[in-house]
Amino acid sequence: MFKYTLDNKKYHTLNYFYKTKFNSKVFKVSLNGNFSCPNFKNGNGCIFCSHGSGDFAGNKEDDLVTQFNEVKTMMEKKWPHAKYIGYFQANTNTYAPLDILKEKYETILKLPNVIGLSIATRCDAISDECLDYLEDLSKRTFLTIELGLQSMHDKTLKLINRGHDLKSFDECVKKLKQRNINVVVHIINGLPFETKDMMLATVKYLNSLKIDGIKIHMLHVLKNTELEKLYNETHFHILTKEEYIDIVCDELELLNEKIVIHRITGDPTKEDLIEPTWLIKKFCVLNDIDKEMVRRNSYQGKRKDN
């Protein structure tokens, strides 16, 4: 049995990480802090964006406590002793003056059974002043900073209009790690015109940064995005389910086994999705990844030194 799992998975599951660290069931509560994104200044933001990553975050019309309690009330019916992490998910959650950040974060930290915060942001939206505050937060609670990279290749970053290059991302991660702040990185498989080798190179690069966790996504083309326009114009290749599973299993084999796998596929809404339609069946994808790892007699980190 693979060491970092409780349910026969062949990779380091988030459930295992939380259970061993906190000895409790832990839920991340997605929150919408009504933030914006600096990349909207560059036009329409990232070409895959539906104007506010975090489509399943709370209702921004509700205050943060209301958003949080709505989820907690449901969860505690089945798990009355659960603990919670406030997940600032929608848009760029450090893109505001420091006093506003403090007010939003501290409001959630004061709530009962909250053991930490997870803050989704961008490498170009964390000032030195903000870094100092995040370091302080990390000493008081379990803090995770989630950064979108998507790809290590500057050519791709420019194509998808990320608004930053690899150097900026690299410098940001190193600053966070120097302050002992947990870092989780988002990557996307199947970005336009990327080869399998390019996707695997991104994972090898992240190994070298000694990140704490990763979220692996499959590129999905959503309605009313710039990506939809590019897809209609170029008909770039969309990974098949079989191709995606093969790439993910290779990535798991390359990733250091201590890196926690926070996500291994996406779950876009059926109404907004154009391609790939196979992504709708999330649990089929997860099961097929498990089957392929078993078929390979493999596990996370098996080829980490390759």
Can you name each region flagged by the protein language model?
Residues 27-31, 84-86, 117-119, 143-147, ...:
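Hydrophobic faces of well-ordered beta-strands that scaffold small-molecule active sites
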Residues 75-79, 105-112, 132-142, 174-178:
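Acidic (Asp/Glu)-rich catalytic clusters
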Residues 35, 90-94, 123-125, 149-153, ...:
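Active-site-proximal loop/turn and secondary-structure-junction residues that shape catalytic pockets
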Residues 167-226, 242-265:
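Conserved C-terminal portion of the radical SAM core fold
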Residues 2-16, 20-27, 213, 221-306:
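Auxiliary Fe-S-binding modules of radical SAM enzymes
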Residues 52-71, 75-98, 113-126, 142-168, ...:
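Core AdoMet radical
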Residues 1-85:
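N-terminal [4Fe-4S]-dependent radical SAM core
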Residues 72-75, 126-140, 171, 200-210, ...:
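Short amphipathic alpha-helices and their capping/turn segments at secondary-structure boundaries
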